[in-house]
């Protein structure tokens, strides 16, 4: 029951955030010439994964013609996925989730990436 409540709250949060994302027909179309990878730096079934997959459902409805492919990269406590995301070509074909652990990684010597290495496009879950 608790897990269902968490999923519903995550989906409600995403729905509220996307309400203001209604399109102006004059805006440029998002790249639809290939799959868009969504890097999830956690294992399948966890909170980050469930949130990302819920967000993907909304993005696919909003950006018709674009196919979003979830890619789980849980190795290294999320380091692998977040480093791959930071190093991705900035062409709109790679999106991803960044978790709170990013704030600790440089201090633990796990990686040199900081929040400055990412371009935030939304905050699907915020306290």
Segments (PLM) and residue ranges:
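Short Pro/Gly-enriched coil loops immediately N-terminal to beta-strands
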Residues: 121-127
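Conserved residues at the C-terminal ends of beta-strands
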Residues: 19, 99, 124
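Short, low-complexity disordered leader/linker segments with a strong preference
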Residues: 1-34
């Amino acid at each position: 029951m608790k897990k269902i409540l968490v999923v519903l709250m995550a989906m409600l949060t995403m729905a509220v955030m996307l309400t203001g994302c209604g399109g102006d027909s004059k805006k440029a179309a998002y790249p639809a010439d290939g799959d868009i990878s969504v890097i999830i730096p956690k294992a399948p079934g966890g909170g980050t994964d469930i949130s990302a997959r819920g967000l993907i459902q909304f993005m696919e409805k909003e950006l018709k013609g674009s196919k979003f492919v979830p890619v789980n990269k849980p190795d290294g406590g999320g380091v692998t996925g977040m480093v791959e995301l930071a190093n991705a070509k900035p062409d709109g074909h790679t999106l991803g989730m960044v978790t709170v652990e990013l704030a600790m990684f440089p201090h633990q010597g796990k990686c040199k990436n900081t929040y400055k290495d990412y371009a935030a496009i939304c905050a699907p879950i915020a306290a």
